[in-house]
């Protein structure tokens, strides 16, 4: 077992207090906490349940409630995180209740859904939470029975003393435990003793989801609630000049039409807000249909922004042709040097063979199935907001600053989200809802249509990369050069593989400014790097006459045994481990004859994933028969959820690589709904996905995003085998609806 110190201060892991009617309550400062569940039918609720932010409650009947500060976005933290607490508490899973906590930054240090952080950053705190409660219950029993605490054991929510034969349920000792001082040290279980962690548990919201129970932001309703929508400029690079709402206000059910300003000239308040528009027009009415119709009757005049605009973005109306030209020009010049090993110029000069390729990817829209929406009820001295957001803590600050209210007077409640993928990290719609409610002096739900969301959203940046490799006369890789950039940011990870495995290495970055709003998109940067890098490495392996898996393994062996440089931010052994496993599980060496197979491996968010994609040609069209996935994400808390996330990432990655792309004409997206923006269809998904996890005792690492990037590279390499052509530009199939 592991002995750990508890930390007791204002933002400490654990606080203790007594519950009304008896019970033990522990509150935590979890970096990325627990989840919510329905009450098990076997469990009778205690008489005096009450809730506080970030706590574990034990009722006098043995029931356990764990509050979840983290937003639930489909990553299954509402199931997996309480499993960690329950295991260390040593309670039967059927006695666990979990509820969504309200936002409270006085208790929680981080309330965020993003960066694949929930389990990996919450792991230790969650374990300590359960272990501390268990220790206090053991101490209470030892005091009651007048025996040493080391003689008290637990199992499934029951305390035992073998010597006397005494036993008691947790509920019987909860009140006594609440009177004890929190221990300075607690014992954590040995990994081999886990009984809940590592077992598959169903999604606690599963029944509610499939039966249509109100869980999501669009489900949220309250008495007297009005509906609002936004009229945006017809293009990025424009601003409001004037508007005439006479006809719109005369429409049935319309309450008001007015301009709103949400921009704040403070980066700390504004970082999670869109920064492309400073003033918008709000339409408010009784129903969505009435507001949509009134919106069509608005007469709005817009004008171009000037070079000295408040937003600090370039003026002008941008088009895809201009974007591509600017990126190509930037890529043709030396960039900002981010890493240099050896003498890459000399290596390329003396190379027997040089391979050079260019890769590009367009802007992409997130397109979660639930469009942006948020509820706000703003009073003179208090604001209640509720809805789907990945960053409630940061948006609380933005809303408070914009409304001029103290932070403690803003209450943000989190609903389940119908998808996010990074889109809901940016809360402009939340600020807009608050400003509209303040103006109306009434509860309001702001709703974006699909066209609103796609036309005025936050996009995955456009990217462009130049890769070069130098081979000597013996086909050894002696030089590697990557020059990578984008609009408006570079996705370059200069210290990741193959850095550290090549003697002569150069990584450069560049950027092109834009007035189009961009931001995080599932596995930021990596969602382009993986397909470009892994496609290029496949070509280099082919040019060297080497098996693509063995070629990568040879490089990783060098990085592991004799690394170049000291700033390599990946574990070469874990990287090689997923490649070895996927080679074995896919039968790469024994079962590849006659198959069109592609392989790729990638590292991000502290996890490692390798894929093999099998493609068949049917009537001249590629059909994805099977995808193999090998995943090293450390200890797998909930295998069923882990498989689901991996499978979903694979389907999502294939769809975006094949079909998804957003182009612009004079500042406006050419694709504004699913009739123009292609997503993967059921018949195009892999017929079979086989997922394997590397077993180890490493603390959990990320999983919501790591399985997404590599499958795109494996797909590109499999398509090459099937079609005989390389795929350098995404989407591989243009926006076709044939």
Residue ranges and their predicted role:
Residues 2-27, 39-738:
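Cofactor-binding beta-sheet edge motifs in enzyme active sites
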